[in-house]
Regions:
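Alpha-helical transmembrane segments and their short interhelical loops
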Residues: 1-5
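Terminal transmembrane helical anchor/hairpin motif
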Residues: 9-79, 83, 88, 118-127
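N-terminal, polar/Ser/Thr-rich
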Residues: 37-43, 88-153, 252-258, 286-288
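Hydrophobic residues positioned within well-ordered beta-strands of beta-sheet architectures
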Residues: 141-145, 156-160, 173, 216-218, ...
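Beta-strand-rich interaction surfaces with strong enrichment in secreted/lumenal proteins
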Residues: 145-147, 160, 191-192, 203-208, ...
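Asparagine-centered strand-capping/turn motif at beta-strand->loop junctions
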Residues: 161-167
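A surface-exposed beta-strand-loop module
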Residues: 169-170, 178-239
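Extended, low-hydrophobicity, Ser/Thr/Pro/Gly-biased non-transmembrane segments
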Residues: 219-323
Length: 323
């Protein structure tokens, strides 16, 4: 296209080298490889265990550049001044070329918007953390978890013993839970307790005097939103792809897995309710640990091996870990 446009071979080659250099060394890693026509900065590695970290976006990015290339190739045909071997419907070629360019830009726009949405949502979750950072909070003394997972849906029941170790009364109890997990009920004994939800924060309408303890049950169900993980790490730094040692491919990043084949959950994804936030985006090193006695019972493993910290014990209907 450049050559047919400029009609100068040397200048065309020079411009193409400059364009390739800009894409390769400057724009290749912008927006996680969106402007990389060669795909060198994309997660190309495929794991037999975890699969591909983002196959849909990967294919859309590659299709984006394929369509853009086809569009410019069509325009080059129209601008190439020579007698054709057979009659060419220039209008049809123009429509196809422009359509390819438009579709390519649309595919690229979708990839860009998805990445932009991830960053915006992470900023929203970080603002929520900062909003409630200075609120007085209780401490979870013990947490008894009953978890069942089917497909990409996680069902949990958490019995929390929360104590107010502050010198002042708590007007409400602050809890944290993954935003994709929907809380169906919070009960103190057999009594339902009112609560409000703001992203990953749960505000339980229960006063707690200094030194007072309360036990209530949180029932929840849903998926895992990985965008709430590691909010204390800069977005570009967190999603910067690293090459696999001894291999030309790069590996993508995932922070949780929930599926039929295997499930991997870490405390950072907030798959169970906690009273102290695991991160502090405003001051990453100012994080207070919450020392809690945990008991985890996993039901309906479907033959899969369950691995968790604590003492393992097989019980009727599931496997229990205490620690």
């Amino acid at each position: 296209f450049i050559h047919t446009w400029l009609r100068h071979r040397g200048l065309s080659i020079l411009i193409l080298l400059v364009v390739f250099g800009v894409f390769l060394f400057q724009l290749g890693k912008v927006r996680e490889g969106l402007f990389d026509p060669f795909g060198l900065s994309l997660p190309n590695a495929f794991s037999e265990v975890t699969g591909h970290p983002g196959m849909a976006l990967y294919l859309m990015q590659r299709v984006c550049w394929l369509l853009v290339g086809m569009g410019f190739a069509g325009l080059a045909v129209l601008m190439f001044q020579r007698l054709p071997n057979r009659p060419v419907n220039q209008k049809r070629v123009m429509i196809v070329a422009v359509s390819c360019l438009v579709l390519g830009v649309l595919f690229g726009g979708v990839v860009y918007m998805v990445r932009e949405n991830v960053e915006c949502v992470r900023e929203l979750y970080a603002e929520t953390y900062n909003k409630y950072q200075k609120f007085p909070k209780g401490n979870v003394i013990s947490n008894t978890l009953e978890v069942e997972q089917k497909g990409n849906v996680l069902s949990g029941k958490s019995t929390l013993l929360v104590k107010n170790q502050e010198d002042q009364e708590l007007s409400e109890i602050i809890l944290y839970l993954n935003p994709a997990l929907v809380v169906s009920a919070i009960k103190e004994g057999e009594t339902d307790v009112a609560f409000e939800r703001e992203n990953q924060v749960i505000r339980v309408a229960r006063r707690l005097l200094p030194g007072e303890e309360v036990e209530f049950t949180v029932e929840y169900r849903g998926g895992i939103d990985e965008r709430v993980c590691y909010l204390d790490v800069d977005f570009d730094k967190l999603f910067q792809l690293q090459p696999i040692p001894g291999h030309s491919s790069t590996a993508g990043k995932r922070f949780a897995f929930v599926g039929d084949d295997f499930t991997v959950l870490t405390p950072e994804c907030l798959w169970y309710p906690v009273a102290q936030p695991s991160v502090n985006p405003a001051s990453p090193y100012d994080v207070l640990p919450d020392f809690t006695s945990y008991s985890l019972q996993v039901a309906s493993t479907d033959g899969r091996t369950v691995i968790a910290p604590g003492k393992r014990e097989a019980k009727e209907g599931g496997i229990c870990f205490t620690g």
